[in-house]
Each structure stands twice: as structure tokens, then as C-alpha cells.
């Protein structure tokens, strides 16, 4: 029964997880939180990760009840993500693999999300909506690849929400997206915003520019409240995501939809997706914040699948790739 230890640190979350044969044994995580109205810089984020990663490693082993000799493989996020945080975590993964004399596996971050989602929900062959701060893709598996049927042509949906949170000076604790979600629940007025869908692709830069420009004016005149703007932004961008997911499901003949990525925690997005799936006679699968948000266990799970399929990453190839496409990986562990 192989046990895989996974390191995740592609953005402002740092996690170390342990998975053994489909069971999550440990999944501790820390978040780098910045002041309201600000984002997180790669260098500062990397310093945060370096400061806590060894404590997280010990915490994961203790929680799992394992010692280094019980670990069969070390997996880490190869990309995509922010360069400095990725590199910092990769150095630790390489060092641990050499110290413990374990094989190493570089894992695609998106595939980590998908494999964890499939494990936790039991979805067999879903159309995947992958939504996070850095990525927005609609994906389906075909012929040993996770094929991208649609994606953002500019910024990710999570980035759109996070940047609007800065305009309103919304707290980044626990995350700007979560706080926008709570404010949106109190919104009562739907403000018309740009809606940009191009086939199975979406664009969020236009709606962000529009609402950034209009927010101060509309708030100053009393035309709407901050809660109304959060509600309107959520409803509009989520409608775009539901539309392209449904189009991909129709194209693939899929009866399953799986939401992964940090934005996938949003209850309103899950409600809208569930309505679409119900109307199509399909089933929606989603996870909670333990597994939607970036975590080490998802890297361990994808690493476990790859390890079982015979994958290994030679030390000389164990770098990082900031723009690591989902469909670049040959998925040999699926039929």
C-alpha cells in the first residue's frame, strides 16, 4: 500500500499532504494573508512558505502516524503557478527525496485538483470546471489527456473577484473570494455588467475594468451598495461559467460535472451549476474547502496515481514550469 507525500505551494497556500491508497491521512495547510486592498507578491509569498514548510512537514507526518521510512514517494507541484513559491517548495521536495532516498514526482497543479475531486466525490468521467485565482478551464478526459474545451482568454475568475475585493478594501482573511461571497448574500440589486462568452471561452478583464471604474461613482451616488456590486459580479461571472460548462457537456455527451479549484467552494456557484445539471439530467459533484482550496493532499493523490502507473521524475528534470498546461500531461493511469 504505497504512501505518497505531496507538497503544494503554487500561490498563497502552502500545504503538505499524505495519501495512502485513496485515503487522506493528513492535509495541513497555511495561508499567506496580506492587508486589505493588497495582493500577494511572489517573493513575499515564497518567504512565507519557506518559514512554515518544515513545520507543516512534521505536522503531516505526525497526523498521518507515519515516519519517513513509511513514505514511498515524494510529489510536488511542478506548475502552473507563481515562480518564487513554486521554486521554494520544489527545493524542499528535492531535498527531502534525496535525504530519505525516495523517488520524486513533479505533478501538474490542475491535475492534482481533478484527481482529488474524483477521489473525494466518486465522479467517474466528469466534465470538469476548474476555477481558481490563477486558472479558469473547462476540461474533459479523452485518449489519455485532460483536454481543455474552453478557458479564459485573459484573467482567471478568481483573479477577477480578488481584484474587485481590493477596490472595496475587503479583508483577505480567510480569502477575498470568501468575503465577497458573504457580502453577495446581502445584495438586493442586480447591476447590469458586461457578459463575454466566446464559444466555450470566457473573458473577465472587461467586466473587471467596467466594475472597477463604475464602483466609486455608483457607491458615491447611492445607486447601489457594495453588497449589490458583489452580488452582481458573482451572478454575472458565474452565469458565464455555467454556460460554457453546459456547452462542453453537450459536446461531450457528459452526465457528470465536477467543480474543482478554490472558487469551487462558492455555494452560489454550486447552486447555479446544480440547477443546470438538473435540467440536463446530469449530476453535479463538488468538494468543500478542505479539498477545493489548494492543498498538499491533492498533489499526493495525483502523485499516487502517477507512481502506481510507473511515473518518476529524474532529479535533473525536477524543476518548475510556471505555464504548465493541463493537456501537456499524458494521463497513463486512466483507461
Swiss-Prot record:
Q: Which GO terms describe its molecular function?
A: metal ion binding; N(6)-L-threonylcarbamoyladenine synthase activity
Q: What does this protein do?
A: Component of the EKC/KEOPS complex that is required for the formation of a threonylcarbamoyl group on adenosine at position 37 (t(6)A37) in tRNAs that read codons beginning with adenine. The complex is probably involved in the transfer of the threonylcarbamoyl moiety of threonylcarbamoyl-AMP (TC-AMP) to the N6 group of A37. OSGEP likely plays a direct catalytic role in this reaction, but requires other protein(s) of the complex to fulfill this activity.
CDD domains, alphabetized: ASKHA_NBD_OSGEP_like_euk
Name the protein family. Belongs to the KAE1 / TsaD family.
EC number from the UniProt entry: 2.3.1.234
Q: PANTHER family from the entry?
A: TRNA N6-ADENOSINE THREONYLCARBAMOYLTRANSFERASE
The main location is cytoplasm
Record's subunit section? Component of the EKC/KEOPS complex composed of at least GON7, TP53RK, TPRKB, OSGEP and LAGE3; the whole complex dimerizes.
User: Corresponding gene?
Assistant: Osgep
Q: Does the keyword Cytoplasm apply?
A: yes
Which compartments is it annotated to reside in? Cytoplasm; Nucleus
Q: Which cofactor does it need?
A: a divalent metal cation
Protein species of origin:
Rattus norvegicus
What is the protein named? Answer: tRNA N6-adenosine threonylcarbamoyltransferase
Amino acid at each position: 500500500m504505497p504512501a505518497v507525500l505531496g507538497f503544494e505551494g503554487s500561490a498563497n497556500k502552502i500545504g503538505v499532504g499524505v495519501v495512502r491508497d485513496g485515503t487522506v491521512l493528513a492535509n495541513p495547510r497555511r495561508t499567506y494573508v496580506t492587508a486589505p486592498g493588497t495582493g500577494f507578491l511572489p517573493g513575499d509569498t515564497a518567504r512565507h512558505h519557506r518559514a512554515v514548510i518544515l513545520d507543516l512537514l512534521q505536522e503531516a507526518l505526525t497526523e498521518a502516524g507515519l515516519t519517513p521510512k513509511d513514505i514511498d514517494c515524494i510529489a510536488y507541484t511542478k506548475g502552473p503557478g507563481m515562480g518564487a513559491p513554486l521554486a521554494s517548495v520544489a527545493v524542499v521536495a528535492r531535498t527531502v527525496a534525496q535525504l530519505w532516498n525516495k523517488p520524486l514526482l513533479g505533478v501538474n497543479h490542475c491535475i492534482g485538483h481533478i484527481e482529488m475531486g474524483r477521489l473525494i466525490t466518486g465522479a467517474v468521467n466528469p466534465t470538469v470546471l476548474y476555477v481558481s485565482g490563477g486558472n479558469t478551464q473547462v476540461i474533459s478526459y479523452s485518449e489519455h489527456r485532460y483536454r481543455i474545451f474552453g478557458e479564459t482568454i485573459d484573467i482567471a475568475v478568481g483573479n477577477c473577484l480578488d481584484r474587485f475585493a481590493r477596490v472595496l478594501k475587503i479583508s483577505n482573511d480567510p480569502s477575498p473570494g470568501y468575503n465577497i461571497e458573504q457580502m453577495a448574500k446581502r445584495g438586493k440589486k442586480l447591476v447590469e455588467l458586461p457578459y463575454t462568452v466566446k464559444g466555450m471561452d470566457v473573458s473577465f478583464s472587461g467586466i473587471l475594468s467596467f466594475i472597477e471604474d463604475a464602483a466609486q461613482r455608483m457607491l458615491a451616488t447611492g445607486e447601489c451598495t457594495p453588497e449589490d456590486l458583489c452580488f452582481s459580479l458573482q451572478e454575472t461571472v458565474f452565469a458565464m461559467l455555467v454556460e460554457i460548462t453546459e456547452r462542453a457537456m453537450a459536446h461531450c455527451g457528459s452526465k457528470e460535472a465536477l467543480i474543482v479549484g478554490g472558487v469551487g467552494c462558492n455555494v452560489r456557484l454550486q447552486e447555479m451549476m446544480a440547477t443546470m445539471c438538473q435540467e440536463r439530467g446530469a449530476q453535479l459533484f463538488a468538494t468543500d474547502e478542505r479539498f477545493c482550496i489548494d492543498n498538499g493532499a491533492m498533489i499526493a493523490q495525483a502523485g499516487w496515481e502517477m507512481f502506481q502507473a510507473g511515473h518518476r521524475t529524474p532529479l535533473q528534470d525536477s524543476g518548475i514550469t510556471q505555464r504548465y498546461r493541463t493537456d501537456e500531461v499524458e494521463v497513463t493511469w486512466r483507461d
